[in-house]
């Protein structure tokens, strides 16, 4: 099970997450958001993540993957991240390809997460790092999320992504079973419910931000509990 702690704004929270066993540290680069990280802090987080890495960097990891079909591709990605990580993730929303690539160059994040209405066919080939794409499961184009090689991993989130709104897990589990889906799950996860989330069909990773905060600030106890319960 992959664990991603998102919305990290400083190296101290990243340290707690990594020591607890997190595989990915997410940072928000969308301007003007409460969780937007300063570039100087992001560089510190990336440096820390790199110091903990067990193996390949992100581009080496992507190049090492063998073209697969359907769930096999995403299971391969899961195994590679687990054995080589941890990795840093930069989250972007409806920002230009040029802006994203500039931040990649400046901060040297490992993965890009597209969280808006970007054209995946346009963006993914032009971005300089592997891409995690966010989907809302009730979208008509959600089957795009199952296409291997187009992106690193699909992330299923609620329509109000980043606001702690929980998906309909029952419907998602049924849909995933029918389509043999593999995905990261976000939306309303907490230390108290993540043990149920990891049992859903198709879940190979969990992604949390607000669920490990108290009054809008990362809560180290909640981070530790979330990772522990996700990896049980």
Swiss-Prot record:
Top-level EC class: isomerase
GO-annotated biological processes: L-tryptophan biosynthetic process
Known pathway: Amino-acid biosynthesis; L-tryptophan biosynthesis; L-tryptophan from chorismate: step 3/5
EC number: 5.3.1.24
A Pfam family per the record: PRAI
Gene Ontology molecular function terms on file: phosphoribosylanthranilate isomerase activity
InterPro entries, per database record: Aldolase_TIM, PRAI_dom, RibuloseP-bd_barrel, TrpF_fam
Top-rank lineage group of the source organism: Eukaryota
Keywords: Amino-acid biosynthesis, Aromatic amino acid biosynthesis, Isomerase, Tryptophan biosynthesis
Catalytic activity: N-(5-phospho-beta-D-ribosyl)anthranilate = 1-(2-carboxyphenylamino)-1-deoxy-D-ribulose 5-phosphate
Gene3D superfamilies assigned: Aldolase class I
Keyword field contains Isomerase: yes
Family from the record: Belongs to the TrpF family.
Xref: PANTHER family: N-(5'-PHOSPHORIBOSYL)ANTHRANILATE ISOMERASE
Protein name: N-(5'-phosphoribosyl)anthranilate isomerase
Organism: Wickerhamomyces anomalus
Gene expressing this chain: TRP1
């Amino acid at each position: 099970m992959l664990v991603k702690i998102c919305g990290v704004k400083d190296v101290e929270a990243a340290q707690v997450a990594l020591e607890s066993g997190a595989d990915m540290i997410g940072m928000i680069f969308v301007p003007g958001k409460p969780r937007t990280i300063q570039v100087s802090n992001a560089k510190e987080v990336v440096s820390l993540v790199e110091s903990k890495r067990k193996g390949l960097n992100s581009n080496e990891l992507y190049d090492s993957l063998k073209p697969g079909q359907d769930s096999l591709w995403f299971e391969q990605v899961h195994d590679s991240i687990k054995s080589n990580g941890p990795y840093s993730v930069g989250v972007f929303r409806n920002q230009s390809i040029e802006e994203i690539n500039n931040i990649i160059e400046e901060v040297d994040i490992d993965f890009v997460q597209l969280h808006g209405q970007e054209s995946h066919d346009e963006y993914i080939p032009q971005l300089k790092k592997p891409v995690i794409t966010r989907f809302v499961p009730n979208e008509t184009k959600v089957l795009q999320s199952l296409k291997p090689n187009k992106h690193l991993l699909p992330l299923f989130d609620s329509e109000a992504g980043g606001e702690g709104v929980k998906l309909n897990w029952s419907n998602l589990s049924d849909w995933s079973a029918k389509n043999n889906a593999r995905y990261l799950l976000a939306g309303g996860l907490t230390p108290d419910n993540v043990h149920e989330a990891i049992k859903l069909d198709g879940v190979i990773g969990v992604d949390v931000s607000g669920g490990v905060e108290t009054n809008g600030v990362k809560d180290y106890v909640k981070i530790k509990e979330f990772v522990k319960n996700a990896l049980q």
